[in-house]
């Protein structure tokens, strides 16, 4: 641990002057941003010893339980049916281009082999396997990008002090060394960026636990130093932080929890300012919980999930769709069925999602748009006979049904394009019309 801490100190000192004038992303980083933006669909995994309680990832806080009580779960955690290759094959079948998994959640338990704490899946459980290592190898084999979620807040450690607003019932003494905690996190991040190959993104969460302004958060968490350290180890790795604010210097993407960019239906994004330059991502639960909740059967329908994916793409954002695996390491069948159905839809309609940007207009009463090259894809999510596409910036060459290539009647007016839609297929979630222009700018 001392050796790791000393190494981190040297890294931070050596790169301080390099970044003194502000963060400049590397060519690899810019390339990763582009690939990330084109991916449009990823899988989020919340998995840890909390899955044994079947009560979601916040079980320790919500029940509540002391850390001493909760930590005994590790001794019984044995996900005998976990198969990294099976997971990755399923995610590929779903049409996902990357996955993001909890390396450590708020309960403080690490799902990887770490020398920074014995409270981890290899040293504290009878399973004694590094699931992140197995997933990194499976992802590399299948060409799926791997990202790591990492919690800034911690309900288990004494050095997470002063305490935040959550985890107050953990039974910790009212004392601790905050700098020790920061060093612990940086030691773990160094391991994650050193032992698991190229990582797409470090996905942070939890700085909101202590509250504060943009400046106060930076001062408390020393984010700029942490970000510089991360980029010094893997210059290409992206950094995102679920702080629900505008982006901080050193961040490479922006995420929105349970909402599309610019919306605040979930109540997390009131103070969020949408970046106009960075890749965007919407993370959404498939049911009502992030971690495994045995009673939660309120899964979104396949149609609703497809609408979410389409609307995210129309907002220049990826959809990061969450699943909470069971304690035995399997993906709930309800989730697997929906993933496979989304994969079949993307096999046919992926051209209108992957590698697209949002169209030139906000959501309309009939639906949304995506764009690629000189084509504008009209996603008619709400059944209509005639629609107005409020865009008149270029000459329209053709309008055809994406399903069969048949021509669609159109009239180009000063206020936009009027489309007379063909008969909608029974049960069709998204009727797509391809508009091809002479050029689009």
Where are these regions (language model features)?
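Mature catalytic domains of secreted/periplasmic carbohydrate-active enzymes
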Residues: 21-441
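Bacterial Sec-dependent N-terminal signal peptides
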Residues: 1-22
